[in-house]
Protein backbone atom coordinates (compact mmCIF):
# COMPACT_ATOMS: atom_id res chain seq x y z
CA UNK A 1 0.00 0.00 0.00
CA UNK A 2 2.88 2.37 0.76
CA UNK A 3 4.26 2.01 -2.79
CA UNK A 4 0.82 2.55 -4.27
CA UNK A 5 0.22 5.75 -2.30
CA UNK A 6 3.73 6.97 -3.17
CA UNK A 7 2.94 6.51 -6.87
CA UNK A 8 -0.49 8.14 -6.68
CA UNK A 9 0.93 11.15 -4.84
CA UNK A 10 3.01 12.08 -7.91
CA UNK A 11 1.25 14.61 -10.11
CA UNK A 12 1.63 14.36 -13.87
CA UNK A 13 -0.20 15.66 -16.90
CA UNK A 14 0.51 16.05 -20.61
CA UNK A 15 2.13 19.45 -20.04
CA UNK A 16 4.54 18.16 -17.41
CA UNK A 17 5.37 14.46 -17.09
CA UNK A 18 8.82 15.00 -15.61
CA UNK A 19 8.06 13.88 -12.05
CA UNK A 20 6.33 10.69 -13.14
CA UNK A 21 8.98 9.87 -15.73
CA UNK A 22 11.68 10.32 -13.09
CA UNK A 23 9.77 8.12 -10.64
CA UNK A 24 9.34 5.31 -13.18
CA UNK A 25 13.00 5.43 -14.19
CA UNK A 26 14.09 5.24 -10.54
CA UNK A 27 11.86 2.21 -9.98
CA UNK A 28 13.40 0.47 -12.99
CA UNK A 29 16.88 1.26 -11.69
CA UNK A 30 15.99 -0.27 -8.32
CA UNK A 31 14.92 -3.45 -10.12
CA UNK A 32 18.24 -3.50 -11.95
CA UNK A 33 16.57 -3.06 -15.34
CA UNK A 34 18.07 -1.20 -18.26
CA UNK A 35 15.74 1.22 -19.99
CA UNK A 36 15.67 3.84 -22.70
CA UNK A 37 13.65 7.00 -23.27
CA UNK A 38 12.87 7.74 -26.90
CA UNK A 39 12.50 11.13 -28.59
CA UNK A 40 8.80 11.24 -27.72
CA UNK A 41 9.26 10.62 -23.99
CA UNK A 42 8.28 6.93 -23.98
CA UNK A 43 10.12 4.77 -21.45
CA UNK A 44 11.01 1.31 -22.79
CA UNK A 45 12.41 -1.59 -20.78
CA UNK A 46 12.99 -5.28 -21.52
CA UNK A 47 13.41 -8.13 -19.06
CA UNK A 48 14.42 -11.51 -20.39
CA UNK A 49 14.84 -12.47 -24.03
CA UNK A 50 13.01 -13.97 -26.96
CA UNK A 51 9.27 -13.77 -27.53
CA UNK A 52 7.59 -12.21 -24.51
CA UNK A 53 4.48 -10.26 -23.47
CA UNK A 54 4.47 -6.47 -23.34
CA UNK A 55 2.62 -4.56 -20.63
CA UNK A 56 1.99 -0.90 -21.41
CA UNK A 57 0.52 2.21 -19.76
CA UNK A 58 0.70 6.00 -20.02
CA UNK A 59 2.40 8.36 -17.58
CA UNK A 60 0.18 11.43 -17.96
CA UNK A 61 -3.22 12.28 -16.48
CA UNK A 62 -5.71 15.01 -17.34
CA UNK A 63 -5.55 16.76 -13.97
CA UNK A 64 -4.14 20.19 -13.19
CA UNK A 65 -1.43 20.27 -10.55
CA UNK A 66 -2.57 21.05 -7.01
CA UNK A 67 -0.09 22.77 -4.70
CA UNK A 68 -1.22 20.95 -1.56
CA UNK A 69 -2.04 17.56 -3.07
CA UNK A 70 -2.61 14.49 -0.92
CA UNK A 71 -3.90 10.96 -1.38
CA UNK A 72 -6.47 9.82 1.15
CA UNK A 73 -7.99 6.42 1.87
CA UNK A 74 -11.55 5.42 2.56
CA UNK A 75 -12.75 1.90 3.30
CA UNK A 76 -16.29 0.62 2.94
CA UNK A 77 -17.98 -2.72 2.27
CA UNK A 78 -16.79 -2.63 -1.37
CA UNK A 79 -13.14 -2.23 -0.46
CA UNK A 80 -10.44 0.40 0.02
CA UNK A 81 -10.50 3.47 -2.21
CA UNK A 82 -7.90 6.13 -2.93
CA UNK A 83 -8.92 9.68 -3.78
CA UNK A 84 -7.14 12.98 -4.32
CA UNK A 85 -7.41 15.81 -1.83
CA UNK A 86 -6.59 19.51 -2.05
CA UNK A 87 -5.76 20.29 1.58
CA UNK A 88 -5.55 24.04 0.96
CA UNK A 89 -9.06 24.31 -0.46
CA UNK A 90 -10.39 21.35 1.54
CA UNK A 91 -11.95 19.56 -1.42
CA UNK A 92 -11.63 16.38 -3.43
CA UNK A 93 -9.65 16.43 -6.67
CA UNK A 94 -8.82 13.78 -9.25
CA UNK A 95 -6.37 11.15 -8.05
CA UNK A 96 -5.16 10.20 -11.55
CA UNK A 97 -6.11 6.52 -11.49
CA UNK A 98 -6.23 6.95 -15.26
CA UNK A 99 -3.49 5.88 -15.70
CA UNK A 100 -1.47 5.65 -12.48
CA UNK A 101 -3.24 2.32 -12.04
CA UNK A 102 -1.67 1.18 -15.31
CA UNK A 103 1.77 2.34 -14.20
CA UNK A 104 1.40 0.31 -11.02
CA UNK A 105 0.33 -2.73 -13.07
CA UNK A 106 3.40 -2.41 -15.32
CA UNK A 107 5.79 -2.15 -12.39
CA UNK A 108 4.07 -5.10 -10.71
CA UNK A 109 4.46 -7.25 -13.84
CA UNK A 110 8.14 -6.33 -14.12
CA UNK A 111 8.64 -7.31 -10.51
CA UNK A 112 6.81 -10.65 -10.77
CA UNK A 113 7.79 -11.93 -14.21
CA UNK A 114 11.14 -13.07 -15.58
CA UNK A 115 10.37 -12.56 -19.26
CA UNK A 116 8.40 -9.40 -19.99
CA UNK A 117 8.77 -5.95 -21.52
CA UNK A 118 7.05 -2.72 -20.58
CA UNK A 119 6.44 0.60 -22.28
CA UNK A 120 5.37 3.70 -20.37
CA UNK A 121 3.81 5.94 -23.00
CA UNK A 122 3.88 9.72 -23.05
CA UNK A 123 0.88 12.04 -23.53
CA UNK A 124 -1.91 9.56 -24.12
CA UNK A 125 -4.50 12.02 -22.86
CA UNK A 126 -3.90 14.49 -25.69
CA UNK A 127 -4.11 12.09 -28.60
CA UNK A 128 -2.00 9.00 -27.85
CA UNK A 129 1.11 10.95 -28.82
CA UNK A 130 3.57 8.41 -27.47
CA UNK A 131 2.00 5.29 -28.96
CA UNK A 132 1.27 7.09 -32.21
CA UNK A 133 4.96 7.90 -32.73
CA UNK A 134 6.87 5.03 -31.12
CA UNK A 135 8.91 2.87 -33.50
CA UNK A 136 6.99 -0.37 -34.02
CA UNK A 137 10.30 -2.22 -34.11
CA UNK A 138 10.24 -1.93 -30.30
CA UNK A 139 7.56 -4.65 -30.35
CA UNK A 140 9.32 -7.05 -32.73
CA UNK A 141 9.54 -9.75 -30.01
CA UNK A 142 6.07 -9.15 -28.56
CA UNK A 143 3.75 -12.10 -28.06
CA UNK A 144 0.84 -9.85 -27.04
CA UNK A 145 0.27 -6.38 -25.58
CA UNK A 146 -1.67 -5.85 -22.35
CA UNK A 147 -2.83 -2.51 -20.96
CA UNK A 148 -4.77 -1.60 -17.79
CA UNK A 149 -6.38 1.70 -18.78
CA UNK A 150 -10.10 1.16 -18.41
CA UNK A 151 -12.67 2.18 -15.81
CA UNK A 152 -14.48 -0.42 -13.72
CA UNK A 153 -13.50 -3.89 -12.64
CA UNK A 154 -14.56 -6.36 -15.32
CA UNK A 155 -14.01 -5.10 -18.88
CA UNK A 156 -11.84 -7.10 -21.28
CA UNK A 157 -11.79 -4.64 -24.17
CA UNK A 158 -11.92 -6.22 -27.61
CA UNK A 159 -12.59 -3.04 -29.63
CA UNK A 160 -10.96 0.36 -29.08
CA UNK A 161 -12.81 3.13 -30.91
CA UNK A 162 -13.85 0.68 -33.59
CA UNK A 163 -10.43 -1.00 -33.89
CA UNK A 164 -10.57 -4.74 -33.30
CA UNK A 165 -7.79 -5.63 -30.85
CA UNK A 166 -7.51 -9.41 -31.14
CA UNK A 167 -8.85 -12.39 -33.04
CA UNK A 168 -10.53 -15.69 -32.27
CA UNK A 169 -7.30 -17.57 -31.54
CA UNK A 170 -6.32 -15.16 -28.77
CA UNK A 171 -9.89 -15.05 -27.50
CA UNK A 172 -9.98 -18.82 -27.16
CA UNK A 173 -6.93 -18.95 -24.87
CA UNK A 174 -7.25 -15.63 -23.01
CA UNK A 175 -10.93 -15.39 -22.10
CA UNK A 176 -11.02 -18.52 -19.90
CA UNK A 177 -8.28 -16.95 -17.76
CA UNK A 178 -10.03 -13.57 -17.72
CA UNK A 179 -13.28 -15.25 -16.71
CA UNK A 180 -11.65 -16.50 -13.50
CA UNK A 181 -11.32 -12.84 -12.48
CA UNK A 182 -14.84 -11.89 -13.58
CA UNK A 183 -13.74 -10.13 -16.76
CA UNK A 184 -16.00 -10.12 -19.82
CA UNK A 185 -15.58 -8.74 -23.33
CA UNK A 186 -16.62 -5.11 -23.81
CA UNK A 187 -16.04 -2.27 -26.26
CA UNK A 188 -13.98 0.74 -25.28
CA UNK A 189 -12.61 4.05 -26.46
CA UNK A 190 -9.24 5.32 -27.57
CA UNK A 191 -6.09 4.33 -25.72
CA UNK A 192 -2.55 3.22 -26.52
CA UNK A 193 -3.41 -0.44 -27.12
CA UNK A 194 -5.93 0.59 -29.76
CA UNK A 195 -3.49 3.00 -31.37
CA UNK A 196 -0.83 0.28 -31.64
CA UNK A 197 -3.30 -2.16 -33.14
CA UNK A 198 -4.50 0.46 -35.62
CA UNK A 199 -0.87 0.95 -36.65
CA UNK A 200 -0.64 -2.81 -37.30
CA UNK A 201 1.77 -3.68 -34.51
CA UNK A 202 1.07 -7.29 -35.53
CA UNK A 203 0.02 -8.98 -32.28
CA UNK A 204 -3.10 -9.22 -30.14
CA UNK A 205 -3.73 -6.26 -27.83
CA UNK A 206 -6.20 -5.92 -24.98
CA UNK A 207 -7.20 -3.16 -22.55
CA UNK A 208 -8.34 -4.17 -19.07
CA UNK A 209 -10.39 -2.53 -16.34
CA UNK A 210 -8.04 -1.14 -13.70
CA UNK A 211 -10.46 -0.34 -10.88
CA UNK A 212 -10.78 3.41 -11.26
CA UNK A 213 -14.06 5.31 -11.51
CA UNK A 214 -15.17 8.83 -12.52
CA UNK A 215 -12.01 9.31 -14.56
CA UNK A 216 -11.16 12.83 -15.75
CA UNK A 217 -13.17 14.39 -12.93
CA UNK A 218 -12.50 15.66 -9.41
CA UNK A 219 -14.62 12.74 -8.17
CA UNK A 220 -12.19 10.13 -9.48
CA UNK A 221 -11.52 7.22 -7.12
CA UNK A 222 -9.32 4.14 -7.28
CA UNK A 223 -10.32 0.79 -5.79
CA UNK A 224 -7.22 -0.91 -4.37
CA UNK A 225 -8.62 -4.44 -4.45
CA UNK A 226 -9.71 -4.13 -8.08
CA UNK A 227 -6.28 -2.83 -9.05
CA UNK A 228 -4.68 -5.80 -7.30
CA UNK A 229 -7.04 -8.07 -9.23
CA UNK A 230 -6.03 -6.74 -12.65
CA UNK A 231 -2.36 -6.97 -11.65
CA UNK A 232 -2.86 -10.65 -10.83
CA UNK A 233 -4.77 -11.20 -14.08
CA UNK A 234 -1.96 -9.65 -16.12
CA UNK A 235 0.63 -11.87 -14.45
CA UNK A 236 -1.50 -14.98 -15.03
CA UNK A 237 -2.07 -14.10 -18.69
CA UNK A 238 1.64 -13.52 -19.22
CA UNK A 239 2.62 -16.80 -17.56
CA UNK A 240 -0.06 -18.88 -19.26
CA UNK A 241 -0.04 -17.59 -22.84
CA UNK A 242 2.77 -15.03 -23.09
CA UNK A 243 5.43 -17.44 -24.32
CA UNK A 244 4.19 -17.69 -27.90
CA UNK A 245 3.18 -14.99 -30.37
CA UNK A 246 -0.51 -14.24 -30.89
CA UNK A 247 -0.35 -12.65 -34.31
CA UNK A 248 -3.18 -10.34 -35.31
CA UNK A 249 -3.88 -7.53 -37.75
CA UNK A 250 -7.24 -5.71 -37.68
CA UNK A 251 -9.37 -5.41 -40.78
CA UNK A 252 -9.38 -1.96 -42.45
CA UNK A 253 -12.31 0.05 -41.14
CA UNK A 254 -13.49 3.49 -40.09
CA UNK A 255 -11.70 4.58 -36.93
CA UNK A 256 -13.45 7.21 -34.76
CA UNK A 257 -10.37 8.32 -32.84
CA UNK A 258 -8.71 11.49 -31.56
CA UNK A 259 -6.94 12.52 -34.73
CA UNK A 260 -9.32 10.89 -37.19
CA UNK A 261 -12.84 11.85 -38.15
CA UNK A 262 -15.28 11.27 -35.33
CA UNK A 263 -18.60 12.61 -34.11
CA UNK A 264 -16.42 15.46 -33.02
CA UNK A 265 -12.71 15.43 -33.47
CA UNK A 266 -11.43 14.93 -29.95
CA UNK A 267 -12.90 13.83 -26.67
CA UNK A 268 -14.18 17.05 -25.11
CA UNK A 269 -12.42 16.25 -21.84
CA UNK A 270 -9.07 17.56 -23.05
CA UNK A 271 -9.53 20.64 -20.84
CA UNK A 272 -6.56 22.97 -21.30
CA UNK A 273 -4.26 20.57 -23.11
CA UNK A 274 -1.25 22.17 -24.84
CA UNK A 275 -3.02 22.60 -28.17
CA UNK A 276 -3.85 26.29 -28.41
CA UNK A 277 -5.92 25.91 -31.55
CA UNK A 278 -8.12 23.35 -29.80
CA UNK A 279 -8.27 25.40 -26.64
CA UNK A 280 -9.56 28.35 -28.64
CA UNK A 281 -12.46 26.20 -29.77
CA UNK A 282 -13.34 25.30 -26.17
CA UNK A 283 -13.70 28.64 -24.39
CA UNK A 284 -15.99 27.30 -21.69
CA UNK A 285 -16.95 23.91 -20.33
CA UNK A 286 -19.90 22.17 -18.78
CA UNK A 287 -20.49 18.70 -17.30
CA UNK A 288 -21.59 15.92 -19.62
CA UNK A 289 -25.35 15.52 -19.26
CA UNK A 290 -24.97 11.80 -18.54
CA UNK A 291 -21.65 11.07 -16.79
CA UNK A 292 -20.72 14.61 -15.65
CA UNK A 293 -17.19 14.57 -17.05
CA UNK A 294 -16.17 17.96 -18.44
CA UNK A 295 -17.06 18.59 -22.10
CA UNK A 296 -16.83 21.67 -24.28
CA UNK A 297 -19.81 24.00 -23.91
CA UNK A 298 -19.85 24.42 -27.68
CA UNK A 299 -20.12 20.67 -28.29
CA UNK A 300 -22.39 20.10 -31.28
CA UNK A 301 -26.14 19.93 -30.63
CA UNK A 302 -26.04 18.70 -27.05
CA UNK A 303 -23.59 18.51 -24.19
CA UNK A 304 -22.43 14.92 -23.87
CA UNK A 305 -18.93 13.52 -23.93
CA UNK A 306 -17.57 11.30 -26.68
CA UNK A 307 -17.59 8.29 -24.33
CA UNK A 308 -21.32 8.52 -23.67
CA UNK A 309 -22.06 9.13 -27.34
CA UNK A 310 -20.03 6.11 -28.44
CA UNK A 311 -21.42 3.85 -25.69
CA UNK A 312 -24.98 4.65 -26.72
CA UNK A 313 -24.80 5.34 -30.46
CA UNK A 314 -21.53 4.32 -32.14
CA UNK A 315 -21.48 0.94 -30.37
CA UNK A 316 -24.93 1.07 -28.80
CA UNK A 317 -28.58 0.70 -29.77
CA UNK A 318 -29.69 4.33 -30.07
CA UNK A 319 -29.89 6.26 -33.30
CA UNK A 320 -28.37 9.74 -33.32
CA UNK A 321 -31.79 11.42 -33.16
CA UNK A 322 -33.04 9.12 -30.39
CA UNK A 323 -29.97 9.86 -28.32
CA UNK A 324 -30.29 13.61 -28.93
CA UNK A 325 -33.86 13.52 -27.59
CA UNK A 326 -32.74 11.48 -24.57
CA UNK A 327 -30.03 14.00 -23.69
CA UNK A 328 -32.44 16.90 -24.00
CA UNK A 329 -34.66 15.18 -21.42
CA UNK A 330 -31.86 14.64 -18.88
Regions found by a protein language model. Name each.
Residues 6, 10-51:
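A non-catalytic alpha/beta surface segment that caps or lines the substrate-entry region
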Residues 53, 184-230:
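Zn-dependent metallopeptidase/amidohydrolase metal-coordination segment
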Residues 295-300, 313:
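Short functional micro-motifs and their immediate structural scaffolds
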Amino acid sequence: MKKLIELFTIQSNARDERRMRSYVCKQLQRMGLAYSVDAHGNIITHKGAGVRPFVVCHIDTVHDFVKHFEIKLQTNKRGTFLYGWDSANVQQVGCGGDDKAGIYACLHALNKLDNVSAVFFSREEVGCVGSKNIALDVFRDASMILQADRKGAADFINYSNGVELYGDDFKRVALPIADLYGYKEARGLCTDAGELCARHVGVACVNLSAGYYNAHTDNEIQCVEELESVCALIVDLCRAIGGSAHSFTPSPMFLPSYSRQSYWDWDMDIWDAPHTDRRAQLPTSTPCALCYSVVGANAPIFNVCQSCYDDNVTFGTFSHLEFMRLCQEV
